[in-house]
């Protein structure tokens, strides 16, 4: 995957100073030399972070799998064909093993198709076709879409805050509470399931005894679709570093409230069942 290169904290701060001084000649720069030195050395990651958000959150590559198995055979009386297929596309996000459930993006498809033709008599042919498919789409929880997450990744400066303060403390500020690390690891997940089932049966009777080539048929078709959305999203709290106390311990200000995980299971209105009978 081609990814753009973004400024590190040192170069971001240096160029920010240049732009500020151009607009405000005679003023003191926003970032002092001490700040620039700390960004460059990385000695104080809590007060002077340098986060490459793209590298920290996105994989350079991911796995896409597709498998197919087909079986066919038969005799003069019956013929059959069966196909099984499976597709799996893993997400591009990097997630920690903090949860018992998957918070990464994932897309899976299972499908099966079966065609059977049976000659009940020398003039009567019965054909049965079956098809089933299930799509499962997993996403990180919360209200932010994939597009919104990418926009956040591309807009966050490298020095805004660390990735986290340990896996249990998501970094952030009052103004910036949408930390991509928190979205991916502390927002729960949502899952969308779309199922399709199709079946058809056709009987064809030859009427050669009346006129050669004449036949009559009857068919029955069934189609059903089901949508199911499972929401297990939750809110998380962010921590803003405020320094060390008298005993040398790190102190933080917290923003937001951790919420209980949602537990909703909804079925879409797009359920469709169609029965179709034909004869001719």
Language-model region placement:
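Membrane-proximal, glycine/serine-rich, low-complexity loop/turn segments characteristic
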Residues: 1-196, 202-208
């Amino acid at each position: 995957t081609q990814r753009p290169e973004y400024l590190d904290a040192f170069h971001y701060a240096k160029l920010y100073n240049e732009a500020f001084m151009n607009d405000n000649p005679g003023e003191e720069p926003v970032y002092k030399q001490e700040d620039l030195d700390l960004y460059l050395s990385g000695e104080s990651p809590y007060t002077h972070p340098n986060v490459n958000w793209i590298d920290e959150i996105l994989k350079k590559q991911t796995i896409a799998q597709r498998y197919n198995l087909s079986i066919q055979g038969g005799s003069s009386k019956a013929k059959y064909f069966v196909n099984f297929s499976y597709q799996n596309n893993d997400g591009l996000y990097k997630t920690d093993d903090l949860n018992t459930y998957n918070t990464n993006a994932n897309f899976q498809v299972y499908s099966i198709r079966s065609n059977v033709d049976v000659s009940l008599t020398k003039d009567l042919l019965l054909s049965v076709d079956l098809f089933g498919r299930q799509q499962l789409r997993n996403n990180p929880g919360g209200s932010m879409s994939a597009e919104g997450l990418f926009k956040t990744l591309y807009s966050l400066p490298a020095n805004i805050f660390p990735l986290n303060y340990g896996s249990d403390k998501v970094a952030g500020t009052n103004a910036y509470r949408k930390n991509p690390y928190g979205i991916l690891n502390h927002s729960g997940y949502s899952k969308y399931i779309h199922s399709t089932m199709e079946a058809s049966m056709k009987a064809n009777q030859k009427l050669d005894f009346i006129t050669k080539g004449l036949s009559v048929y009857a068919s029955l078709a069934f189609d059903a679709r089901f949508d199911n959305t499972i929401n297990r999203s939750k809110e998380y709290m962010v921590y803003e570093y405020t320094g060390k106390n008298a005993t040398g311990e790190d102190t933080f200000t917290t923003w937001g409230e951790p919420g209980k995980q949602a537990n909703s299971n909804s079925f879409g209105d797009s359920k469709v069942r169609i029965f179709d009978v034909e004869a001719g």
